[in-house]
Amino acid sequence: GGTLVVQYNTKSSDMVLPDTLFGPYAFSLTRDRVTVEEAQPTFLAKDHPLLNTPNKITEKDFEGWVQERGLYFCGKLDPHYTPLIAWNDPGEQPLNGGLISCDHGKGRYIYTGISFFRQLPAGVPGAYRLFANLISTRTTP
């Protein structure tokens, strides 16, 4: 059991593994990003534990973000994954690969392209609340 949180990655020519092998099931990496820090989230799985425990994540948690929402989102997903949030820059299609999760064995795998590396040093409260949810998640054996 346990939780593995994998933060953003990008495809490169020196990768040892294909980008489809970053998780227990296949997904592709893209260079997709959402750069408008005010982009409104759409919650795709409102009842998912990662959006509710220990903190109920709402639109308010995405206020005050700096520079961008995220980058290197997932593209094609194996059906085992649940995409949790979608965003889009103005005039663009929504991207739902910024935060995905799946149960695997007795644990949970999470991939996120959310720009925590910018939000946490900037002291954005909602980023801390969401990250706390990611690292404190539990699964049922």
For every predicted segment, state its role.
Residues 11-13, 89-90, 107-109, 115-118:
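Short, solvent-exposed loop/turn segments at secondary-structure junctions
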Residues 68-77:
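Active-site Gly/Thr loop motif
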Residues 5, 84, 110-112:
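Hydrophobic/aromatic beta-strand patches that form the interior of the parallel beta-sheet core
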Residues 94-105:
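Short, surface-exposed beta-strand/loop micro-motifs that present aromatic residues
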Residues 1-3, 107-108:
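Loop/turn elements at helix/coil->beta-strand transitions in domains of secreted/extracellular proteins
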Residues 117-127:
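A short acidic/glycine-rich loop-to-helix N-cap element
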Residues 2-64, 124, 130, 136:
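A glycine-rich, often tryptophan-bearing local segment used as a flexible ligand/cofactor-contacting loop or short
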Residues 77-86, 98:
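Short, hydrophobic/aromatic-rich segments at coil-to-beta transitions
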